[in-house]
């Protein structure tokens, strides 16, 4: 799995990296180290949140995604369009122009991920009404948050909403829709235009599906440049949108929670705020809430690092669009699918096995880490190349650094003590 993460999360341009250590302090899972003056990633710990991409002053972190020409491998191409994409465009009064432009850049069909979002909202409402969920329910729409919970807050896994992400639902429905035209499945390529690297990795890894419904994941930024040119050429558009406000509002933080239709909900965005909420939930200090929506990016999906627009501007545009949409574009009754159709198809697997799979060995390693930690200054300065003293201890015990590696600050203090005694 670490190799898959290396290929489909974030890579490093070592020529650009200046070893400034901004990224090691920003990473929420302490997955980055500075070694020999350059950043390096412990991919088993990476949740693909994109924070290192966002914070890097030298643009040395490169998010992974498929290049646009990947669509050429298929005779028929389907574009899956996230609602956050609509907020990237200025002066586009009708989103059907955006959808029509997709057909001019190489796609035969377009399908809105917002439809999948609407259906997930309706299924969530149904499950709440049937009292089938463990409260408080935690949304699983943001794959970076899902990875964070899976690796760092394992005790909360039972609270996760057991449903597919909207993009997986949209991909399933899109494939079925195209199949009804008599087109062989092997000739159809389904491509998601992603606002963030977390969705790239989640779709490549098939985290909650038994088979991948998506064949490629493109970057909003790359596709945007092609769309802008084509939109400017259009005199008219086709009426292609089937989404309502219920799906559109998923583009920004709070939209999913509002769609769940429960009074006691909470929505938080930004990875530091997400961690704070999860810690409060884990220690029992967060109470009297039934649904929790968490997004790693500021503003929600409009804040993804693969987007082109300022997230606050994009969110404002999305809000202004609401008046042009019906409340619900596609209902469960219209698609005729049972609840099981929307359920996650498999349980999450942990990627991070930092201390090994043998519990006895893992416990012994943990004790060694704690003993070593007692000897350190506990100032989390980052001089050693690790983000914290505890992370340094883990690196020593796990053999990630050469034998004999010591804390430079502790060494300096010991040297000073010796000098004073002399």
Task: Give, region by region, the residue ranges found by the protein language model.
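Iron-sulfur-associated redox domains of electron-transfer enzymes in respiratory
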Residues: 64-382, 387-422
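Iron-sulfur cluster-binding cysteine motifs and their immediate structural context
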Residues: 2-14, 18-43, 47, 51-66, ...
């Amino acid at each position: 799995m670490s190799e898959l993460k290396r290929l489909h999360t974030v890579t490093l341009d070592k020529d650009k990296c200046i070893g400034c250590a901004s990224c090691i302090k920003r990473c929420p899972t302490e997955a980055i180290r500075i070694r020999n003056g350059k950043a390096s990633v412990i991919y088993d710990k990476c949740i693909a949140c994109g924070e290192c991409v966002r914070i890097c002053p030298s643009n040395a972190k490169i998010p992974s995604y498929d290049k646009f020409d990947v669509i050429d491998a298929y005779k028929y191409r389907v574009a899956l369009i996230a609602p956050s994409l609509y907020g990237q465009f200025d002066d586009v009064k009708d989103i059907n122009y955006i959808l029509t432009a997709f057909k001019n850049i190489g796609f035969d069909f377009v399908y809105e991920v917002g439809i999948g979002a609407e259906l997930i909202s309706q299924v969530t409402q149904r499950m709440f009404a049937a009292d089938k969920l463990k409260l408080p329910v935690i949304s699983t729409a943001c794959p970076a948050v899902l990875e964070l919970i899976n690796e760092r807050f394992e005790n909360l896994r039972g609270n996760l909403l057991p449903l597919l992400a909207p993009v997986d639902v949209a991909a399933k429905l899109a494939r079925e829709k195209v199949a009804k035209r008599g087109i062989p499945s092997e000739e159809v390529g389904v491509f998601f235009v992603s606002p963030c690297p977390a969705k790239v990795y989640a779709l490549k890894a098939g985290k909650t599906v038994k088979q991948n419904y998506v064949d490629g994941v493109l970057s909003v930024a790359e596709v945007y440049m092609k769309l802008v040119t084509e939109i400017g050429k259009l005199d008219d558009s086709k009426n292609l949108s089937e989404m309502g406000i219920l799906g559109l509002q998923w583009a920004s933080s709070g939209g999913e929670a509002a769609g769940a239709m429960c009074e006691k909900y909470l929505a938080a965005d930004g990875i530091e705020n997400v961690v704070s909420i999860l810690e409060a939930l884990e220690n029992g200090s967060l109470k009297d809430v039934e649904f929790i929506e968490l997004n790693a990016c500021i503003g929600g999906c409009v804040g993804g690092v693969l987007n082109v627009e300022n997230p606050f501007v994009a969110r404002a545009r999305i809000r202004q669009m609401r008046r042009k949409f019906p409340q619900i574009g596609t209902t469960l009754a219209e698609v005729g699918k049972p609840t099981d159709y929307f359920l996650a198809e498999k349980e999450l697997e942990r990627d991070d096995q930092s201390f090994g799979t043998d519990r006895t060995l893992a416990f012994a390693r943990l004790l060694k880490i704690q003993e070593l930690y007692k000897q350190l200054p506990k100032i989390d300065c980052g001089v050693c190349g690790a983000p914290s003293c505890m992370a340094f201890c883990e690196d020593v015990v796990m053999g990630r650094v050469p034998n004999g590696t010591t804390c430079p600050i502790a060494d300096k203090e010991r040297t000073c003590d010796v000098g004073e005694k002399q």
